């Protein structure tokens, strides 16, 4: 497997709708206001995806237990805003602005941006498997003892694309993966 460069990512986004909407280049300043942004868009060997305005922040209002086999949404507070405050030592779910369609011979890895990591904000996203498509559900942990701010419509993580020299026998779409074509923030399901 080899990592794919900006030219390949651009061609796949524009000709195969692999990333929608696609931003051709790094954006780090709001052109209208001059405000600095956490960068997003096409980079040399990846694509920096953005957070949407949808967030789900963990709360313990009902004294619940997090159980991935029996997950209830009453452990979340849903927020729609340009920023989200993640409580100290807590966790939030969000989704990407971008919708991805991964080719059959490609696997991605997603790595959190250093700007957030240096603030104690850790991002986890599982690989996008061959022929998976959907909005990306993003797990965000605030490892600090302080509230942490995350920004909608700005970069949160970088997606790296790896192309195999051979095609897999069974893709995510073939096995009817449970998170196929997910819209919005998708909570755990078994």
UniProtKB/Swiss-Prot annotation:
<comment type="function">
    <text>Catalyzes the deamination of dCTP to dUTP.</text>
</comment>
<feature type="binding site">
    <location>
        <position position="182"/>
    </location>
    <ligand>
        <name>dCTP</name>
    </ligand>
</feature>
<feature type="binding site">
    <location>
        <position position="181"/>
    </location>
    <ligand>
        <name>dCTP</name>
    </ligand>
</feature>
<dbReference type="GO" id="GO:0000166">
    <property type="term" value="F:nucleotide binding"/>
</dbReference>
<dbReference type="InterPro" id="IPR011962">
    <property type="entry name" value="dCTP_deaminase"/>
</dbReference>
<feature type="binding site">
    <location>
        <begin position="113"/>
        <end position="118"/>
    </location>
    <ligand>
        <name>dCTP</name>
    </ligand>
</feature>
<dbReference type="GO" id="GO:0006226">
    <property type="term" value="P:dUMP biosynthetic process"/>
</dbReference>
<dbReference type="Pfam" id="PF22769">
    <property type="entry name" value="DCD"/>
</dbReference>
<dbReference type="InterPro" id="IPR033704">
    <property type="entry name" value="dUTPase_trimeric"/>
</dbReference>
<comment type="similarity">
    <text>Belongs to the dCTP deaminase family.</text>
</comment>
<comment type="pathway">
    <text>Pyrimidine metabolism; dUMP biosynthesis; dUMP from dCTP (dUTP route): step 1/2.</text>
</comment>
<keyword id="KW-0546">Nucleotide metabolism</keyword>
<keyword id="KW-0547">Nucleotide-binding</keyword>
<feature type="active site" description="Proton donor/acceptor">
    <location>
        <position position="139"/>
    </location>
</feature>
<dbReference type="GO" id="GO:0015949">
    <property type="term" value="P:nucleobase-containing small molecule interconversion"/>
</dbReference>
<dbReference type="GO" id="GO:0006229">
    <property type="term" value="P:dUTP biosynthetic process"/>
</dbReference>
<dbReference type="InterPro" id="IPR036157">
    <property type="entry name" value="dUTPase-like_sf"/>
</dbReference>
<dbReference type="GO" id="GO:0008829">
    <property type="term" value="F:dCTP deaminase activity"/>
</dbReference>
<feature type="binding site">
    <location>
        <position position="172"/>
    </location>
    <ligand>
        <name>dCTP</name>
    </ligand>
</feature>
<comment type="subunit">
    <text>Homotrimer.</text>
</comment>
<protein>
    <recommendedName>
        <fullName>dCTP deaminase</fullName>
        <ecNumber>3.5.4.13</ecNumber>
    </recommendedName>
</protein>
<feature type="binding site">
    <location>
        <position position="158"/>
    </location>
    <ligand>
        <name>dCTP</name>
    </ligand>
</feature>
<keyword id="KW-0378">Hydrolase</keyword>
């Amino acid at each position: 497997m080899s990592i794919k460069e900006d030219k390949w990512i651009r061609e796949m986004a524009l000709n195969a709708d692999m990333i929608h909407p696609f931003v051709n280049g790094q954006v780090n300043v709001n052109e209208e206001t001059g405000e600095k942004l956490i960068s997003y868009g096409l980079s040399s060997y990846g694509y920096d995806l953005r957070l949407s305005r949808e967030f789900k922040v963990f709360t313990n209002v009902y004294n619940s237990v997090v159980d991935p086999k029996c997950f209830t949404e009453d452990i979340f507070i849903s927020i729609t805003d340009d920023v989200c405050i993640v409580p100290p030592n807590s966790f939030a779910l969000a989704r990407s602005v971008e919708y991805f369609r991964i080719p059959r011979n490609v696997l991605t890895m997603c790595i959190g941006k250093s700007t957030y990591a240096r603030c104690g904000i850790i991002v986890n996203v599982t690989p996008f498997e061959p022929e998976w498509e959907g909005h990306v559900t993003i797990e965000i942990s605030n490892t600090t003892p302080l509230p942490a701010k995350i920004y909608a419509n700005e970069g949160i993580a970088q997606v790296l694309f790896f192309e195999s020299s051979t095609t897999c026998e069974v893709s995510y779409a073939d096995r009817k993966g449970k998170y196929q074509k997910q819209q919005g923030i998708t909570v755990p399901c078994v």
